[in-house]
Amino acid sequence: MEEEEGADDGEQGEEEVLVVNVGSTYPCKRSDGSQHDAEIVKVRYNKQAGREEYYAHYVGLNRRQNEWVDKSRLVLTKPPKEGETNGTDQEVTDTAEQPDSKTPQKRKIEEPEPEPKKAKVEEKDASKNASSLGAAGDFAEELTCPLCVELFKDPVMVACGHNFCRSCIDKAWEGQSSFACPECRESITDRKYTINRVLANLAKKAACTPVTPVEKKTRPLEKCSEHDERLKLYCKDDGTLSCVICRDSLKHASHNFLPILDAVGVYREELSAIVAPLEASLKVTEQLSSEQSDKIEQHNKNMSQYKEHITSEFEKLHKFLREREEKLLEQLKEQGENLLTEMENNLVKMQESQDAIKKTISLAKERMEDTDSISFLMDIKAFIDKCQEQQRAVISTGNTLLSKELCQGTFKGPIQYIMWKELKSVVIPSLTPMLLDPTSAHPNLHLSDGLTSVRYGENKLSLPDNPKRFSQCILVLGSQGFDSGRHYWEVEVGDKTAWDVGMASESSNRKGKIKLNPKNGYWAIWLRNGNAYKALESPSKSLSLSSHPRKIGVYVDYEGGQISFYNADDMTIIYTFNATFTEKLYPYLSPFLHDSGKNVDPLRFVHNK
């Protein structure tokens, strides 16, 4: 509405503007070119077009044909001004007629309005129509399914008393293991509902009865902001909610669409598929975190025990070995703290991963429990991408349990003997002088007269059989066993290409083929093919040695449950077994076969000279 200049006198005049009243009926040009009486239900201001638009209900027609129109499509009549005639000499009647409620009225242009969108439309007979419009709106709302927001079709009532279209509630519950009312979220034991025939009849009558359209109470974002049509579709390509007009627009050309309820089912299932492995990952992470905490606790206990052992050994060396003691303690501290830091950092990482997984699961479950299809599908793809990113992060970080141990052989070994190697002039440790037991030797083994060395012979010796003798494995035991205390002995292996060195329990099997491992009472290491070292665990473990040892040292701590093997040339640790010993332990040796003459040298116990 504007002020225009007068054509003749240049002064500003007033222009009468025809007013469209809400609740009034006008002839209206329909989109198909026909003309039909239309009742104006509501008004809006179209910012893009810069004009007011009116929601027209075509009297007597289905409400689905209602549409927004501008003033140009309404046939408006201009009422005569006071005192004017119709072109004859008739006098103006003395009686002023009261304008009909459905007769368009005029209004004068007053001051320019600051904002077009704030322009007010006069509503006549508002008080007269308010009651009927409100009642009609409430009635229509009671007959509307809360899921599809349409009149009920084949309505059913669930246990809590809420009603839904049968197809809507079936889609909402599809693929779920537990059920809840989409409206109030009350848990429902069985997937059962009751047909509501009364509501079905009312909905049918409402669909067939022309009802004065009223503005529905809609939830936020229930209508398309661009076309003001109900959002019924979900665009899979753009990840947006769309109306039917959006679907047919160029913007969405060749895009794939799903009905909203179908989209909810698809993406709820996709979220469920993400949550399941995340929950499994959470359980694994929680278990690993618990085990890591136990490892840290045991690690701290071991550090304390090793420190006590080291201190007690070094006290025997007095001030001559103080410098070496401090050096070794520093080594223990550095290695222990490094290992502890690694494990603690790993625990922190696991806990952070655990918290992130819990948060993602919580958000995903909260999203899945959202019964509002509109809010559920808002940015659902971005939310799923975020969940998948968390899933990939769990897989890529690969939560693993760190189970690194302190070097038991270095910190809890024969400390005094190691020190003796460095300080021969200060201390002389006790090296146990071992001898071989001829009653246990395999018939192909030849023992020296002093019972200190053994070699393999091609010819079998004629020896009496007894329970102690090995019948198939080429082994021999030492004559001295240990059932308490700490002991250390050495065997010279020289340049042999194959050998076995270890400890055997007193009751271990000696007959037939024997699998050498701790389960069968054997704790040993061996060499094969000149460079293949193994610890005979179950299963066996390959060992990587920095140098080829010519002498092997064996340390036994019976009460401590420890058997450690060393390169006796420089006292570097090779391997440590841990076990609980319940019977006497004996050294055992095997010089193995000749290997075409490459392995003919004997094995020899080392004695102090």
Swiss-Prot record:
Compositionally biased tracts (Polar residues): 85-102
InterPro entries reported in the protein's UniProt record: B30.2/SPRY, B30.2/SPRY_sf, Bbox_C, Butyrophylin_SPRY, Chromo-like_dom_sf, Chromo/chromo_shadow_dom, ConA-like_dom_sf, PRY
PANTHER family cross-referenced by the UniProt entry: E3 UBIQUITIN-PROTEIN LIGASE TRIM (PTHR24103)
Organism: Xenopus laevis (African clawed frog)
SMART domains, per the entry: BBC, BBOX, CHROMO, PRY, RING, SPRY
Residue ranges occupied by any Tudor-knot domain in the UniProt entry: 21-75
Residue ranges that the Swiss-Prot or TrEMBL entry lists as coiled coil: 278-371
Entry GO CC: cytoplasm; nucleus
GO annotation, biological process: innate immune response
GO MF, one example: DNA binding
Protein's name in the database: Nuclear factor 7, brain
Main location: nucleus
B30.2/SPRY domain residues: 413-609
